[in-house]
């Protein structure tokens, strides 16, 4: 909140936010179908639509239908909009999440490996426990607490065996510990680490000239990863956290374009990093195949610019 908002008394704030009692009642699948039809949606096969509504919640499907609305207030659909188009979008989004999640997995494992190798050679096996190597003591303290929690929750045999055998230091060495912490914790650890020379070394292994780009990208990847893990809609999502985009990079890249609020730029960061991990560029070929399988998807709504397929990164 801005300071001006923070001191608003409670009753006044209710007036600002438009607090109302929520009075919508739950409705069954037959009523859901009728409601969609009343709003102008064409349903080609009612039996299949009902089956889908029993397995995918109405609210989840509605988030794909929003894209077809003519007016947001009454939720009337544009002429010719069909339930099947929404299901297509839903299935496209689901496959897209799976591809992205798989690519992020490779980046995540690679980042862990580089942090273990590069930071340990200089700062030893327990560098992540040395507060003098980190900036912002409070944030670091919180990060270390998370590491302790995540290690104690881990069911990995190598963690259990380690704690049965050794009592000091209180955590296993970095090559064990970093394998079980979350990507969010890993990226915080990287961002809080003080030795910028080593961070630059890690960034360069990903083809990035400055560590600040890597920090920005892994923060965005953490958010994207969580969206995928929680099955959130991502195809036309607007991301609050935007990746820093260099104009030029040593490997295949894109021309500087509009503001990076949509998925396109997030995909570009994944593709760029993938070039340094798997030379066969799995994600790119899978994405191009997916776009061919769903030719009706509006790539512009995902932030894809005119002529994107001619960019060096996508060729």
What is the predicted function of each stretch?
Residues 2-315:
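Long, contiguous internal "core" modules enriched in hydrophobic/ aromatic residues
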């Amino acid at each position: 909140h801005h300071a001006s908002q923070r001191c608003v008394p409670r009753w006044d704030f209710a007036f600002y936010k438009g607090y109302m009692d929520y009075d919508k009642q739950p409705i069954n699948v037959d009523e859901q179908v009728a409601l969609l039809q009343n709003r102008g949606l064409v349903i080609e096969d009612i039996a299949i639509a009902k089956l889908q509504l029993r397995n995918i919640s109405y609210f989840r499907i509605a988030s794909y239908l929003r894209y077809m609305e003519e007016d947001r207030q009454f939720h009337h659909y544009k002429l010719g909009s069909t339930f099947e188009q929404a299901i297509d979008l839903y299935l496209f989004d689901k496959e897209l999440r799976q591809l992205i999640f798989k690519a992020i997995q490779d980046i995540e494992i690679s980042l862990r490996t580089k942090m273990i190798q590069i930071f340990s050679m200089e700062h030893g096996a327990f560098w992540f426990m040395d507060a003098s190597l980190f900036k912002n003591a409070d944030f670091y303290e919180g990060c270390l607490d998370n590491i302790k929690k995540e290690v104690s929750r881990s069911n990995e045999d190598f963690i259990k065996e380690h704690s049965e055998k050794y009592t000091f230091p209180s955590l296993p060495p970095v090559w064990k510990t970093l394998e079980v912490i979350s990507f969010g914790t890993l990226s915080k650890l990287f961002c809080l680490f003080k030795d910028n020379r080593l961070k630059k070394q890690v960034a360069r292994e990903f083809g990035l000239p400055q560590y600040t780009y890597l920090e920005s990208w892994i923060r965005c990847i953490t958010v994207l990863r969580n969206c995928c893990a929680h099955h959130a809609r991502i195809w036309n999502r607007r991301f609050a956290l935007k990746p820093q985009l260099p104009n030029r990079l040593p490997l295949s890249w894109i021309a500087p374009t509009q503001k990076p609020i949509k998925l396109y730029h997030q995909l570009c960061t994944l593709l760029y990093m993938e070039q340094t991990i798997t030379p066969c560029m799995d994600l790119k070929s899978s994405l191009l195949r997916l776009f061919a399988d769903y030719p009706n998807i509006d790539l512009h709504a995902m932030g894809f610019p005119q002529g994107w397929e001619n960019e060096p990164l996508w060729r």
